[in-house]
């Protein structure tokens, strides 16, 4: 444990020192080179006028975010303990909401309709998902700064992954895709990653948010006794959350539904993470009313007995055999389909 602490302290001291800042500054330069190496992000050669060929919004937004990133890289910012604590708690309260707005505006730019067209109840339920995820990160890291950074990174990864997945198969992420991970990996090498202006801005915003959060000093949230209490409370929150969002019919009762094969058409009505959570409910398959395994066995018993008798008769004689078999009527219901 002491070796691990020393290693972490060494890494922290490196990035706080001159060599660490130079290393991060070199990464910023490489990021700018990577941007200009993709002309589609800022240049349209088919425009008739020279100045119209450049995407002003892309150059201004990405350029501005890059300038902020460079400033945060080279500038030493130190807050007093009291100010740092206040800013840390503000970050803890605001990060899930910022992640919600950030992801929804990105999806609005790519596929959906404006966030303000989503009904208020669905917006509230969507925001709750972000805060519950944030509670999980707080439980894991016991640090607001670390939980906020993880929230930003996970939001960025999910947003870009969902966008690329939709481009690849014309279908957004649903919960059953988890069981197709191996298949997805096997065909991933056939897909060409596509980066557009909105994705570049989304990625740059993630870097800026992480850089801002790293300017805060780490504040331990709970001591070990408080952490135990928080773990118990968190488990209660997760239990209630999964019961409402996954195992109950509440979301269905208030009209939250989705199309299995075109879920992105429902994302625009309910928000991204609320729709994603709704798809997890379809992994929980419940038995139809009056369904009984014993009743099925009782009905099929006479036919299985006849089948064994028929097999014996075939060995002795091909005559005088009974071939009584049932008529099977199958009623398919897609809602009872096991997506696993």
Could you tell me what each predicted segment is?
Residues 1-7:
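Short, intrinsically disordered terminal tails adjacent to the first/last structured region
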Residues 8-266:
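Transmembrane and membrane-interface helices of multi-pass
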Residues 1, 69, 130, 147-156, ...:
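Aromatic-enriched hydrophobic runs in primary sequence
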Residues 245-340:
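Soluble catalytic regions of membrane-associated enzymes that act on cell-envelope
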């Amino acid at each position: 444990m002491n070796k691990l602490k020393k290693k972490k302290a060494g890494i922290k001291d490196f990035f706080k020192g001159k060599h660490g800042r130079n290393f991060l500054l070199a990464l910023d330069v490489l990021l700018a080179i990577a941007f200009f190496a993709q002309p589609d992000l800022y240049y349209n050669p088919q425009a008739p006028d020279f100045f119209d060929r450049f995407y002003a919004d892309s150059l201004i937004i990405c350029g501005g975010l890059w300038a902020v990133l460079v400033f945060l890289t080279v500038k030493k910012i130190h807050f007093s303990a009291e100010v740092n604590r206040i800013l840390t708690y503000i970050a803890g309260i605001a990060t899930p909401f910022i992640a919600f707005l950030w992801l929804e505006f990105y999806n609005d730019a790519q596929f959906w309709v404006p966030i303000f067209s989503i009904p208020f109840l669905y917006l509230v339920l969507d925001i709750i998902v972000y805060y519950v995820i944030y509670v999980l990160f707080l439980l894991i890291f016991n640090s607001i700064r670390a939980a906020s950074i993880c929230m930003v990174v996970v939001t960025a990864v999910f947003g870009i992954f969902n966008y690329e997945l939709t481009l690849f198969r014309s279908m957004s992420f649903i919960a059953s895709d988890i069981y197709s991970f191996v298949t997805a990996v096997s065909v991933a090498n056939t897909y060409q990653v596509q980066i557009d202006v909105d994705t570049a801005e989304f990625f740059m915003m993630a870097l800026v948010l992480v850089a801002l959060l790293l300017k805060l000093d780490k504040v331990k949230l709970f001591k070990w006794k408080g952490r135990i209490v928080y773990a118990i409370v968190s488990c209660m929150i997760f239990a209630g959350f999964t019961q409402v969002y996954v195992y109950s019919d509440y979301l269905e009762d208030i009209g939250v539904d989705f199309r299995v094969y075109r879920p992105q058409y429902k994302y625009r009505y309910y928000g991204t993470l609320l729709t994603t959570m709704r798809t997890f409910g379809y992994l929980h398959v419940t038995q139809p009313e009056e369904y009984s395994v014993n009743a099925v066995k009782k009905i099929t018993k006479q036919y299985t007995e006849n089948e064994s008798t028929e097999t014996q008769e075939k060995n002795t004689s091909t005559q005088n055999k009974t071939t009584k078999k049932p008529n099977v009527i199958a009623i398919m219901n897609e809602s009872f389909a096991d997506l696993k």
